[in-house]
Amino acid sequence: MEKPVTGFSIRYEFGIFRQKIVDGWQMEFPDNWLEMGDVWLHPRKDDAVEVRFGGQVHEWMDGGKFKTAQTGYQSVIAVPHDLYISGYNSTAVNKLTLWSASMPQSFDMNAFSRGDYVRALEQNTMAEAISKVLYPADDHINGKRLRLRQQYLLVSSSLQSILNEHLKNYHTLDNLSDKVAVHINDTHPALCVPELMRLLVDEYDYGWDRAWEITCATLSYTNHTVMAEALERWPVSLFQEQLPRIYSICQEINRRLMEKLQRVYPNDPGKWNYMAVIANDEVRMANLCLTCCHKINGVSQLHTDILEKTIFRDYYNLDNSRFLNITNGIAYRRWLCQSNPALSGYLQTLIGDGFLKDANALEALEQYRGDLDVLENLRAIKRKNKVRLAAYIAEHNGVNVDPDSIFDVQVKRLHEYKRQLLNVLYILTLYNEIKDHPEKPVFPQTFIFAAKASAGYYLAKQIISLIVAVSNLVNSDPQVQGKLKVVFIEDYKVSLAEIIIPAADLSEQISVAGKEASGTSNMKLMINGAVTLGTLDGANVEIRDRVGDENMFLFGMTADEVQALWQRGYDPHQFLTPELDRVLQMLTSGALGQRFDDVAASLLTPRFGAADSYMTVADFESYKAAKKRAVEVYQDRTRFTQMSLANIARAGIFSSDRSVEQYAKEIWAL
C-alpha cells in the first residue's frame, strides 16, 4: 500500500501459552516464540533507550520554569529489534520494532563477591521479566505490576525512538504533529498520553499548554471493546509506586479536565466522576485517551454507535467531531490466498488475478451464481479442505469425522460473551433428541471448537472442560454415530486456523448483541465460503448489509432489545424451556462424567454476578431454530453453495487494505 508506517511492540520471549487439555482441563505451557523466529530480527543496541520505574519525583521552580527530577529509580534498558515486512507486489517495506528489556549492568559483581549469588542476578532477572511473556496473568498484584511495566516500557521506548528520529530529520519538535501520527491501538498503549507530555515538558522544555497542543494533535485512539474489564483501570497505589512522574502528569491532566467539566457541566458531579482520568482510587486508561486524542474510532458501525450512545457518550457530547467508525479488516491474502490456495487458484481461473491487489474484484464471482459446474467445483474444493481437517482431527484427537457432514465451526478465544456455552447446550439438546427418537433421520453434523481461555478465567476454563466432556459423551455413544460428532481442537493459533477456516461450512458468530466490538473470525470464515450463523452484533451487522438475510442465518435479540430486557428486569427462569432445563440438569447430575454446577449456576443464579449475564437462556430458542434452518438449507446443496459463493464475492469490503486506507486518510492524514 506504500504507506510509510512503523509498528512498535515488545520482543516477547514467550507467547500467551501452549494449550494442552489434560483430563478435560486446560493446562498452560510455555510457548517459546524466539526459538525459531529470532533469526529474522535485527538488533540495534546503539539505539537502546533508558526507561525509568519507581523512585521519587522532586519538583521545583527555576527562574519561572517548572522543573522535575526523578531519583532512586530502577533503570531498564530497552533495545530495539527490527523486523522488516514487505507488502504483496509492492516496493514498500515497513518496519516492526520490538523492544527487549534488560538492566544497564546485567551482573552485580559486588554481590557475587560477597557470596550473594542470587542477588547478583536478581535485578537483571526482574528487568528481563518485562519482555518475557505476552499477557501475564493479572489476577494478582504481581501480574498487574508486570503488565503495567510492560505497557510503560513499550510506550516510553517507542516515543523516545520516534522523537529521536524526528529530531534527526527536522531539529525541532514544533512540527511533530505535522510529520508524525502516533496511533494508540486499544488502551494498552494509553500511557502514550502522559509519556509524550513528560518528554516534551521534562526533556525538551516545552510549557504545558504547548506540549498538550502537540500531544493532542499527534495522538489518536482506537477502542476495541465495550467490555468493562478491558477498559483498563490501574490502582492509584500501584500506578504511583511504579510510575511516579507519569502519575503526577495524570493528576495535572485530571485537574485541568475537572476545571473544564465544572464549567461545562456546573451541577453534575456524577458526570465529572464518570469522565475523570483519576477517580475512585483508579487511573482510567480509556478516559486518558478520550481526554487527549484528536481522533477516536470504533471498529464496526454498531460498536461505534454503542460507544457514542453509551460508554463514551459524555465525551461524544462534549466534542463529537473527534469520533468516527473504521470497521476492522483482515489480511485476506493470508486468509484466502495462503490458507486456501485451491480456492484462490480456482477464483483466478474464473475472474482473473485482480482480486490479489483489490479485494473488491471478488464481486465478479457473482456472475457464476447460476453456473452449476462452478458450484460443483466450489463444493469439491470445500470437501478437499474438510478432508484435510478431518485428517488433522484423526491424528490429534483420535476422532474420525465425516467430511460429508456439516462442519459447524466456532473458533475464537473463550469468553462468556462469545457464548460457546450456547453452542454446547444446543449440542446436548440435539443429543437428547437423537437418543429419544433414534428412528428419526438426522443429517450428520460435526461441531468443531477451538479456543483458549485466559489462565485466570475460571468459568471460561470450566466451559472448555464442559465442551470436552460433551465430546467424550457424544463420540463414545454408538447410538449417535453417523449423526453427531463433537471435537475440541487444542492449542488454537494462526497455523491451526489456516487448516480449520477453509474447511468450515457454518461460521458461528453468536455473541450476545452489543458485546462484540467487531470480530474478525467472521470475516476470515466468510471469505472462505462459510455461511454465518449469528446475531446482529459487531461486524455481523455489516456482513448482513453486504450479503442480505437470505445468505446468512440470523437469530437472537438485537442490541437494543438486549438493553430493553435488562431495563425491564431479566429473569432467565422465565425463558427456561423443559428441553433446556433437562440439559442444565445434565450439567449438575454427573451425567457428563463430572459435575458442572458453576456453569449451570452462572446461568440461573447471581453467584457470578447477574444471572445469565450474556442472555444465553433468553436467546436459546431462537438459536435452536436457526441451527435447524441451517441444516435444512445445507441439504439443498445448490442453494447452500450459492450462499457460500455470495459470501466469498461480497467479502472484499472487509479487507485490511480498505481499513488501513481509511485510517491513513481519515486519521493519520497520510
Predicted regions mapped to residue ranges:
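A conserved ligand/cofactor-binding region detector
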Residues: M1-L670
